[in-house]
Amino acid sequence: MRIETLLYVYLFICSGMIVFNIITAIVLKRRDRRTVRASARFRQHILQQIERINTGQQVERRHKKYLSRLLTRTGNMIAFDKMLEDLYREEPRQATEYLSQLGGVIVYLTIRYGRKDRIEAAYFPYIIKKYHLIENRPFSGVVDAMYTLLRESSIYCRENAMQALYTTGDCDCIMKALKILDGGESFFHEKLLADGLLEFTGDHEVLGRCIEKSFADFSPEMQMAMMNFLRLDSGEHCAFALALLQNTATDDEVRYACIRYLGRYPYGPAYETLLELAECRNDARWEYAAIASTALCAYPGDETIERLKRNLYSRNWYIRFNASKSLERMGLTYLDLIDVMEGHDRYATEILRYRFDIRNLTQKEAEQECTS
């Protein structure tokens, strides 16, 4: 009897799930149909305004009121977004000109969406970023609303607000936004910031100078994100990175980021510092030697090779691994490292043999691809 009861309960749950899936599919299908119909209505109205633009006229005031009224509903905004995607594929120049005349509508909608639920509030900054609605014209009302969203606990609000601000092309806006994030209590991953800053539509050289100028005003976590951005962006900040690296008061994580920067962009004056850091004199600070062993790959030479060969005998696995990887990437062969390969340190020999085996396998795979 107990087994039969369990079977009935199981069948009831399965039936409920099937009914739920059917209802959900019906609701979503009806919603898609409404979105298509709404997109068609928007398209009809907007094509009329584009005809006016083509004849040298402005977008009608009543059309702006029409948009301000309807687009406050998220469902209509989704339909508007779908219509704009199609319009940009067909007539990109006219679509851009049309949107450029909706400044007042954008400000109004930004304020209205800022009062909505946090998920809905995060949606409009996504639209701003997608169509570059404030590129080279950062309306104060819109920018202030984005600053407000940066103080929210929702990661969607903060990330989408930053994405919108990247399109302003205004370095001052970005620096203020970074300070707001830095002063907030919510965690914001440095990779999101480093990758996001690469999408900045303004002058990256000017932004880099602004970062250097205000660098000391930020927390170590934000400084690390900034250094990662500079590393991915350009090699114009080598002197700045070296100065930070040589300053022992700089946070360790920031100094690690500086070593990686100098490993990506070889800088002569940094060579001696990197050689010194690659020598592990303190097991408690092995990270410097490990990261510097990787960076030295960009500084080939006899001193570099000798330093890396000595690191193959380190007690720390990461130091040995990075040193072997750098030696292999520098193109050294078995014969060049015969003294290590035929030496008495089994760990040094094994890690080099591993690197050479990996290189040989990669070369064989490449040859097979060429012949096939």
Residue ranges and their predicted role:
Residues 64-68, 100-113, 136-149, 171-181, ...:
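Amphipathic alpha-helical scaffolding segments comprising HEAT/armadillo-like alpha-solenoid repeats
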Residues 111-199:
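Long, acidic/polar, low-complexity amphipathic helices and coiled-coil-like
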Residues 43, 63-64, 80, 255, ...:
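Short amphipathic alpha-helical segments that mediate assembly, nucleic-acid/protein binding
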Residues 26-115:
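N-terminal topogenic membrane-targeting module
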Residues 82, 86, 90-100, 122-134, ...:
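Structural detector for internal amphipathic alpha-helices that build alpha-solenoid repeat scaffolds
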Residues 154, 333-372:
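Eukaryotic acidic, Ser/Thr-rich intrinsically disordered low-complexity regions
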Residues 1-40:
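N-terminal signal-anchor transmembrane alpha helix of single-pass membrane proteins
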Residues 116-117, 153-155, 184-187, 218-219, ...:
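Short inter-helical turns and helix N-cap capping residues of alpha-solenoid HEAT/ARM repeat scaffolds
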